[in-house]
């Protein structure tokens, strides 16, 4: 949906060289919750301005789509550090997301929820999708019902 205009330096922590990435914010089609991906821009292609439009595959999916995601706010999502060690710290250092203090224990390990700094249009789109799919966060659903 939206690829951030900021180009971040990212070290994959797996022996690969440092690369340049941009974040993409979208939503999972099954429940409308926030989906965050990283798109790679190899350093030897830095001179190509619209490379991201040519690349359709993300380097990495930062968030994970699980049923408990519907309990989180519109701008929150669980981050899986099993596949990308240290990604939580990287998100914080670069000002992309902040920890919420919410955790979920799964068979794959402990997942931490983060609140992402989203562009307004992305936030509005996710809010709209979650209303359409009836997967709004419970606290917001109760607040809307109390207004009636």
Per-segment meaning from a language model:
Residues 137-141:
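Short, intrinsically disordered terminal segments enriched in charged and Pro/Gly residues
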